[in-house]
């Protein structure tokens, strides 16, 4: 309600009592009428109640005029019906008295001033009151409510529920079968929920685009919610109705209250302590209820009656017809109606929970609920409560916590309402609301003050005069301090602020507000903490709450001071605020150091200065002074100062200014100095005049200091310039971004989504490709990991092998006492221990590394077979060693012997060769005994070797080596002692005896082998010692000689031992040959070498090639037989032993061939040459000899296995063992074949053809062509020279152009004109131009002075008529020459004049004149460049230079869309300005650097218009903008072409990807290749067989042909695949993408992609740090950055995408190349990769087509052959039958006749099928076409031609060569079917006679049938004539009857013999 609404329209002057009594009477009547008419309503309402799904629980009413658009408004009620109260009237005394006294007449509606504006849209529209009742009783009627209101139980929901209600009252929510019903229900919900009203059209379309199922789900959920709420409210309906009836009859006012004046109605009087409030619900049907409140003085407060809206309340009450009290409310708080809260507020009984519920309800409920709350004036009720309880009360009352909470809760509701337009309207309409909010500005609670400030900010958000006035009035209102509880509390707590005031003093709201703000800031603690802070600060939320409050306060101040349009009002407000201390408050706010608040303070200052400036300008305008006119300014100043003391000062000031300026002007100094001086003076005057202080001297000093600070250094100026440039660039970027966004916005509905989807698809494709590449790389990484682990396995194998080799070698030692040393082949104990330790450490380290790598890689590999065997073998050896440790060697260890020495067999050998002394007989037994002992020692050594083979532990080696060395030492001593006695120590004798008794020896060895007790060996050693003592005496005589020989041998042994040590350290795995050599050279003993060989063969798994072959120092006496015997014995022992043999031994014995030993003579030869004086030299020579022998054996094919040093390190033993003689040879041949099978390098290009070969002819041809050109060009010349006598007319082809088409050419060079010799003969003299023209010009133009001179001529050139000219007109229709007469006649009639206008050619005179004027201008460009400008810019020829330059600089759309122009202006030869051109154009050029406007540019020294057009364009663009023109055009080129180039490159990449994917996924292609490989390996020899082939092999498949040269190898492959594996042929369709990518060069594609990305990067760098970064150098009109910057991010994005994609593509491509065995590093291989596949596919298809054609021909041939053979067979059978039949009957003849007819029919059909004309070549087809044409043209002469032909024997074949005697052979040669007979060509005379026709009736029937069948078989195009066919058939039948029955027919027939 508006303020003072009751006073201005009150016409009654009744007393207060009368008014009061009248109100009560009306209220009683209204209550009675409500009680009686509560259930009455319109018929529509009643009917709707009947159809309600729940009876009468929910009442609905028809929609009003503003209701939902889909519902029809009910008809207006008649005058006799009861009308509701007007919504816009207030329930005051005047309105009630009008109802009582019947002052409302007829249909005149009642309105009040305080009604809402009609412009405000409300959810509820009510009909105006129009009552014509005779009585004064008030009736109530339900009015139509808005169906668009989003109430919880609206009419729409109830109507929708009724659709799903069954007759029995149950509700079944099932989806309707009609989708339209679901659409309607969904749309109703959207409107009911107010969703469509708050969404844009596109979002509405998106909602309506939901599927039917989704829409029904939403509808069903809404209906279920409505049903749930309806059922919850049904239970309280009866109680609600009863309590409603009770409340209607309850007396509203129980105490008398007087109304002093109508001002008390619905408003609060500011002067009286008693407040009377009336709350009007503004609804149709009203019910009054009031709550009286008494003040502290005992006065009763009259509360206005409150109207009631039954329909709305009933909706929210679940169907109750009347309102209920709080006690009868249901428990569900969400369904409380607005009237409930209003009643509770009026009764001041609203609890804190209900306040919170009200606040939540206002925020969360639909708008109709809030509208209903506002319509019930709940906000006014809350304002009244606050006014009565806090803001206008007695001083003795205290401000309790409940009151503060109530105030805070009410202000929360106020803030929610202020967010709505209805709430803002109510706040601005009722002064009570603004007063209440203003009172809350200085509340003691910070949150309340903040909310009050926010409410005022919402009111002043938009410039609204009424709201501004309402706020301003409330702020300017005065109040008494003692009436406001907040001020009373502040007065008591902070008396220092109120020292000059009392409780009776009055303050303005604005003062109290600013006081509250300041004391809030003063309550802030130290350094923003709670130390020293006030209670309000501590309880108000801390620092953040203070900051937000200050921010809202400053926002409110700025809104308040800038809301008014009146500058005086704004300045007055600021002045008042500053007087109240706002500046002091701002200073305190600045201490908070909050940016947002400081910004608001700066905004306040800026607005203040702006208003001040406007005010000054307005004051100056009052003096009629033009501030922009200096004369007016000086005149006014002079008028003011004239006649005063200021006159001299003003004159002095002007004089000084003039003198200082004129001095600089006279000195002709630079204008910049004058600018600086004027700037200095202006700055000084500005700072002095604007300063606000009163001290003039201070102002001057400050002004000067400020000026100096601003201009103190050049650095500041430069920085300012740079900042300006940066800001300018940023502005351009922002503008460009704005344009780009606007363009995107314009495209939002036209493809932007599609573009984004395409980009998303591109990224998805790149991601998929990246995933594929990652998978490939992961697979490669897994393979590398496996290889690494396998290498670890191999390393372990090598270490174990070396450790086994080292452990298996016997230990050698020295005998220092006797001074002899054995030849040492192995290391001493310490070195061996060190090596073993190193190997064991390496083995453990390898195991650890393998475990670590396996753990790191997350994968484990099973060891290979060899490693498993080695591990198992070493474990077995360790187990054997443990068993040996348990053996008792105590007796043997007590006699510790010296380290053993090797037996020197070479000495024995030498002794054998010398002359030996005969042995003494008694000594023979000793010798035999010694031999037996040696055999026993050999067995002992064998057993010891067997043990050492499996000995790994060092301790076990030492035990057995000591025993073995002791025996060997004793044996060596014996040999040494008896060496001089001539004893024969030949090993042959020793080895023969074991051969004889092999079985016995083996038995003994088996017995000895079973025992390892050292006592047995000790007994044998004792016997040896005894024999040795006997033989020592005999040895003395040869001791000296033996000593000398021992010294030589020891030297050799030591040297070889040293060499052996070095070799072992250098190479841990020597070759097998070197091992055997080491054993033979170092040990020198048979058993020792055998131990080494045995250890190497069975201990390490290797085969010894020649264990005893290299006997450099001996011939292996006793070793050969002993070797085989011991090996056999050892193998027997090994089989019987518990230690299982290695599984690979059998494999080795199967794969490794046995090595034949060297022959005896070779060994003897070696022995004879052994042991020279120099032992080292002899050893070296022995090695050389061994190597030579090995090579010789390999060459002779005797050596089975040769392994070099490198192969032993790397090759696998099984693989090496396969190399025999044949394999070696095949391997060599394979290698050579592989080398030869590689594709040869491409042949070099053929040399260029020598120029001398064709030089003269080419030169002559060129000269002749030039001559022709000269003739053509000279033919166009307008003024030829007078001609000589004319030669014969030249060919017409030499002269082509008419006169005037081209400008006159330059004269032809003499060289060309004189070159007439050569290919063409000398030409005649040149023809006159007139005759040359006559070849092509119109006959209207004269060809010679004598011809066509009488024809009329046109005044201007016309379009030419091109015709074929007839030169010779004699004896033709043109000879009369009548055309000239017709021309004269037409000319006289004006027809030719009209023709001249109609066919006028385009005028070129203007262009010629322009060109002539242009030629007069200056040009510096070359002719070529000028012509290029004219050609490339021809589309802009109509534009002037300035317009063209402007178009180019502005980057117009048509310019950017012309790629040719952009490309031309980007050419390097165009944009590069040479030094000479720059110097020439310097006077015409303009410097645009730093120029922002065209007017500011310095004009050039010379006028550029003096230059030609091309020069002007070149000057304006390339010269003036040379500093950045190149970069500019590059940027524009990228911007205009990047999308096209990106799409082209992307398309090529897509093709490559498809091809790569096809090749990767095509298993059929791989299968075809495997078929080719299989067939090729079958055809090739073993040396040329391969595991795969390169792609270049595919090209050679067509080179190989079969024996008949009819089919290639590829044809056979295709046939094999098609017949046996037909599915493999699918690779032809799978590899279709490969054919599309053949023409794409991979290298070029990669380079193009790199160039594309690099060009974009270059442009970005140019914009960032390059030539385009400084926009001050640009032309003022240049908009290159605006066009470039928006596009660069998108271009860079595409460049990055393309770069990533090409990288992935190339990775996949190179991986594919590796897959097919190609080298990715070979450029030629990359280029030809896809081409090889494409060629193969094409050749394969061609081969397939050839095969199919050949098979089809073969099939047809076989078919025809079968048919003919069957016919021949039947004919032969018939002949036999006829021959057998002697007397055929007539019936039989008839049957034979029928059979003959059928046979003739069959043969005839066969002949007709095969007798077709053969296909001829196209040349014969052309000949036939020509002949056919000639034949048609001369059809009349055809019969004569046919009659003239001379035919032979009635031939039925028509041929032009019929008269040729050789034609018969030609015909027979060319015809596929031999001719049977030759008859005469049929004519009309040759037809059979009628008598013959009757006789041959059957034959004619057969021929007709044959002819019809022939047409069906061959179609209508078969060139067969009916007569010839008929004659042929008749002749055959005649011949058949004449011949005998048994003869065969002579028709056309194929025969196969």
Curated annotation (Swiss-Prot):
Domain FH2, residue spans: 1348-1766
InterPro entries for this protein: Actin_filament_regulator (IPR051661), ARM-like (IPR011989), ARM-type_fold (IPR016024), DAD_dom (IPR014767), FH2_Formin (IPR015425), FH2_Formin_sf (IPR042201), FH3_dom (IPR010472), GBD/FH3_dom (IPR014768)
Domain spans labelled GBD/FH3: 174-696
Biased composition (Pro residues): 1238-1250, 1278-1292
Molecular-function annotations in GO: actin filament binding; identical protein binding; profilin binding; small GTPase binding
Source organism, top-level taxon: Eukaryota
Compositional bias segments (type: Low complexity): 31-40, 232-246
Compositionally biased intervals (Polar residues): 41-100, 110-143, 263-278, 1217-1237, 1880-1896
PANTHER family, per the entry: PROTEIN BNI1 (PTHR47102:SF2)
Name of the protein this chain belongs to: Protein BNI1
Gene source species: Saccharomyces cerevisiae (strain ATCC 204508 / S288c)
Organism placement in taxonomy: Eukaryota, Fungi, Dikarya, Ascomycota, Saccharomycotina
Gene: BNI1
